[in-house]
Structure formats: C-alpha cells, structure tokens
Amino acid sequence: MPRHRSYLLPELVLTAGALLVLVLDVLLPRTQRGLLAWATLGVLAATTIALKPFISAHVEIAHGLIAVDRFALYFKLIFLASAALTVLLSVRYLEVEGASPGEYYFLILCATLGMMFMAGGIDLVTIIVGLETMAVSFYILAGFIKPNQRSNEAAVKYFLLGAFSLGILLYGMSLMYGLSGTTNLRAIATALAGQERDPRLVLAVILVVAGIGFKIAAVPFHMWAPDVYEGAPTPITAFLSVGSKAASFAILLRIFLEGMPTMGPEWRLLFEVLAIMTMVMGNLAALTQSNLKRMLAYSSIAHAGYLLMGVVAGTTRGVSAMLIYLGVYTFMQLGAFAVIVMLRRQDAVSYTHLTLPTIL
C-alpha cells in the first residue's frame, strides 16, 4: 500500500500538467501550438497511470476531507476519458474558430481536477471547492469563442443561474452543518442518526436536492441546459453534458447515501418525483426540437431522469446499475457530439437535403 502522503498523486500530476500546458502556450511559436493538444493528452494519460496504485485502496486522507476508494476511482476514470475525448474533438474546432488553445486546454484540465475532488470528497468543504473549480472553468469555456454572441450569452446565463443554484446548495449544506456540528459526511450521518425528524433537516434535504438538481439538469431545474448547450462550443457542450453530470451524480451519492441515510424516505420521494418529471419532460421536449444540439440537451435531461432511478432504488444493485449506465452514457453522448463536430467540418452543400434547416 502506498504511503499516506502519496494518495493525492493523480491530482498533483494533473495540477502540474495544467500549469505545464500554460507554460508551453507561452514558449511555443504560434505555428507549433497544435502540440498543446498532445501535451494535454499526455497529462491525462499520466494522471490515469498515477491512479493505478490505488485500485484496491479504501482510505480517508487529509483529516477526513477526501476518500480514496473504488467509487472515486471509477468516476475519475470517467472524467479523464471524457476530457481526453473532448480534447480530440477540439483540435480542429479550435483551428477553425481561431481560438487560443493553451487557455482552452488549461481550463479543461482545471475542470477535470475539480471533478476529481468532487468524486473523492467526503467533506462538504472539499465538495464545494471541487464543485466551484469545475463550475468556474465551465463558465469560461462556455463563452470561450468571444466573437460568437450565442456563446457569450450561454456563458452569462450559465454563470448567473449557476451562482443562484450554488447559493441554494450552500444554504442547505449550512443547515446540515448547523444541525450536526461537522462538515464530514460520515460524521454527519452519525450525528443525525440519533436525532428525531427536524423540519430544518427536511428543509436542508430540499435545498440540497434543488442545488444538485440544477447541476444534473433535472426538471424543473433544467431551463439553463438547452440554451447553454446550444451556445457553448460543441466540444465543451459534450464535456459539460458528460463530465459535469457525472461529477454531480458523484456528490449526490456521497451526500445522500453517506451523509443522510436516515433521511432516506424524504430524499427518495423527492428524487422519485424529479425522475418522473425529468424523463417525461426531457423526452417530450426533445421530439419538438429542430436544432440538433438542443435535441441532445433535452436527451441529456432525460438521461438524468434514468440515472435518478438508480438513486431512488437506494440499494447496492441500484447504484451499481446507475454507475454502469453512466459509463455507457459517457461514450454514447460524446459519440453523438463527435458526429456534430464532424458535420460542422463538411461542406454545408452536402447536407442541403436535410429536412431540418437548423440542424446545426
């Protein structure tokens, strides 16, 4: 078993790699900046290799702030794979748009770093730090193509609604802390186990569900998703629909299964209602779309409903099924957006026969 201090090696490798990409962006001549994509892929590969010693680990580090276990490892592999595929989708896209690759790839790595801390976080502080690292990176990436008005609008809308949802989530977490006296999820579960039902605790559950509901784009907290998905750069839309959703489900499982198992009847009922509304609304709205990215946005919303069913089950099999579904969804969704990127590269005349004039 590796030493205690080495458990953060993957995160340290990713952080150093992100800084290296920024340095290379300054040092490399403009004609050779295409190498930054390969450097970014190398960083992601090195981070993946750094995870290998911890396959069988099951420990808490940093005074109970972070857990190194198979649950976190599975999500980290999803994040790294989705980031790598996003980089591959972005190479030609950035050339066409004339955008700066160094900052772009740096932000992708920062978003991935935030997701990794979210997956391993077993403390409310760690979860919030990881969540905001990811969110701020996506706010910038959503509006990365500055001349594009829709991209700028998507970034502003995502930022404003994201800040509002964060406030709701923080309020719910502050109630959890106030009622338990700790921010560690497992200590919260222990503290709440002997307490009677408190209306403030029910309010905390509702607020946390609402805050995370925004992040996973569950109905009725989904209104930002279609506009942001449509306006953001296509590779970032792909990464946002996969990486951000997976990371949000990771903290959802951590908070409710580890932090508030005694409130199971309350949060299961809430997630059951959200799952039904999300599946129905997501699929019906997707049928009426004439823009492919908006259609995939509503498809992503519907998939959030399917994933919530595993949470509603609240059993080991339910969670396992949800994790398998999430892994398959990752590659399916990225493949769908890869088709959009491919179509965008082709001569538009080749697609004039399509019956949906605003397909892209």
For each of these PLM feature ranges, what is it?
Residues M1-L354:
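Alpha-helical transmembrane segments of multi-pass membrane proteins predominantly involved
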Residues T355-L360:
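A short, hydrophobic C-terminal helix/tail in secreted or cell-surface proteins
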